[in-house]
Regions:
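Basic, polyanion-binding surface patches
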Residues: 1-205
Length: 205
């Protein structure tokens, strides 16, 4: 199943516990679910540290995991104790957020600052149980982007080289060489579809 739902973006989620211990973990069940306002979701198998911290203080950040940070991301996936600081374990520096308390990964070229909106218990979660699958939805209240990746007002995502999760232990990476542009077709007055022609005209459809 997971090998077919691919590639999947990686949500590198940072939270803070009640005793101010930092937590950092990657989640490949992650994606945007709405824009204007912006919402993201990630799904946790069992009530893990990230979920507990988010439900306690209502905030998290999501840093973009890239080719350059792949080793740190992998270290932060280790199933360590609840009070372990994965930033320290992975030798990753933090950078302060503007609108939430949890920091972002300093080396990440982009990050989202989020407020917890809702946790949805999927059907395999028994009442009061910490076992099963939990979907966490957050509203994005702030966005950080490294200026060097903004060109003519457009984010050059491919230059960031974000990682993607495949199946099994496989990963992918987005690069300028593996991306391409396709214009969407238009519908003519007679109802027929007209194929897009030429270069992208700069209009989002």
């Amino acid at each position: 199943f997971k090998a077919l739902i691919a590639p999947r973006p990686i949500g590198w989620i940072a939270t803070i516990s009640e005793d101010n211990t930092l937590n950092l973990a990657p989640y490949s069940f992650f994606n945007a679910v709405a824009a204007n306002p912006n919402y993201v979701m990630f799904s946790s198998v069992e009530r893990k540290d990230s979920l507990r911290n988010i439900e306690q203080n209502g905030e998290f950040t999501c840093s973009l995991s890239t080719w350059d940070t792949r080793d740190g991301m992998n270290v932060s996936s280790a199933p360590v104790d609840y009070l372990a600081d994965e930033f320290a374990l992975a030798n990753l520096e933090t950078a302060p957020s503007q609108f939430v308390t949890p920091p972002r990964v300093a080396r990440a070229p982009a990050a989202l600052e989020c407020k917890h909106w809702k946790t949805i218990n999927l059907p395999d979660v028994a009442p009061g149980s910490d076992d099963g699958h939990f979907m966490i939805i957050g509203q994005v209240v702030g966005i950080y982007i490294d200026d060097k990746f903004i060109q003519d007002g457009i984010v050059n995502t491919a230059e960031m080289r974000p990682l993607a999760r495949m199946g099994y232990m496989d990963y992918g990476v987005i690069t300028p060489e593996t991306t391409f542009v396709m214009q969407r077709p238009t519908v003519k007055d007679d109802g027929n579809v007209e194929a897009a022609k030429g270069e992208w005209d700069g209009v989002y459809r």
